[in-house]
């Protein structure tokens, strides 16, 4: 049984369904147990297909109407009006639609999934916001594409899903320098336990800051850390620290009914 996390600011909207899905309720095994929705993983393709079908059914969408992207940690947002197969998914990091019954989604395993909706224009979006994409402007690109489809930013509600927490996100000096280059205000997203320690980066806070700067109507942030909650979430960083061969991807999706 699927039990996605829902954001209050989106679940209260008529005609919009969404979910930040956890790793539970699927058919995959091993490293991918159990709701791995990533076609780019080395999981059994039939398992990934069944997991994605379960998500689509939960949202009331047809199995072919769950749209994900070939994510590249960039700032490209695009609009879709009809089904796109997992094999033909376009390279982008945010997807927008105003087509009823078409569920737009992103895959994550530590990066921030962001779901957005303008209930009046009936335009929804899903964005994949890692630090690189967020710094490059993926949030701003998603909002701009929503506006091209008739949304107004002062009506847009946004929810940030489960992301790696600051306590688990240790970064090196080059990372810090890149984020501070030309924007000293980003310093507030870095924390050091002591003067000699490596900084820890607040990715969900950084994404929330970009959403706030975009002037949206409401922003909600989910607090669970993907790294620290192994029974609930996949985590790329955790898999790297354990030298595991691969990792699963959880999905976040939104649809206009």
Where are these regions (language model features)?
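Active-site microenvironment for binding and transforming phosphate-containing groups
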Residues: 1-257
């Amino acid at each position: 049984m699927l039990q996605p996390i829902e954001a209050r600011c989106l679940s209260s909207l008529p005609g919009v369904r969404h979910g930040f899905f956890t790793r539970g309720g699927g058919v995959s095994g091993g490293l991918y147990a159990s709701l791995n929705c990533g076609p780019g993983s080395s999981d059994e393709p039939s398992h990934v297909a069944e997991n994605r079908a379960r998500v689509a059914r939960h949202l009331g969408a047809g199995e072919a109407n769950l749209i994900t992207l070939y994510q590249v940690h960039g700032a490209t947002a695009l609009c879709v009006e009809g089904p796109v197969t997992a094999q033909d998914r376009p390279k982008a990091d945010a997807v927008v639609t105003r087509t009823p019954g078409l569920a737009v989604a992103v895959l994550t395993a530590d990066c921030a999934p962001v779901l957005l909706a303008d209930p009046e224009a009936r335009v929804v979006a899903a964005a994949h916001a890692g630090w690189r994409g967020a710094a490059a402007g993926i949030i701003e690109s998603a909002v701009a594409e929503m506006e091209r489809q008739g949304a107004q930013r002062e009506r847009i509600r946004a929810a940030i899903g489960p992301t790696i927490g600051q306590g688990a996100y240790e970064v090196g000096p080059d990372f810090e320098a890149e984020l501070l280059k030309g924007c000293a205000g980003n310093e507030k997203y870095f924390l050091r336990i002591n003067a000699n320690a490596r900084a820890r980066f607040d990715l969900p806070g950084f994404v929330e800051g970009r959403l706030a700067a975009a002037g949206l109507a409401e922003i909600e942030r989910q607090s669970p850390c993907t790294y620290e909650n192994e029974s609930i979430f996949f985590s790329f960083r955790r898999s790297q620290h354990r030298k595991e061969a691969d990792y699963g991807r959880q999905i976040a999706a939104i649809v206009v009914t």
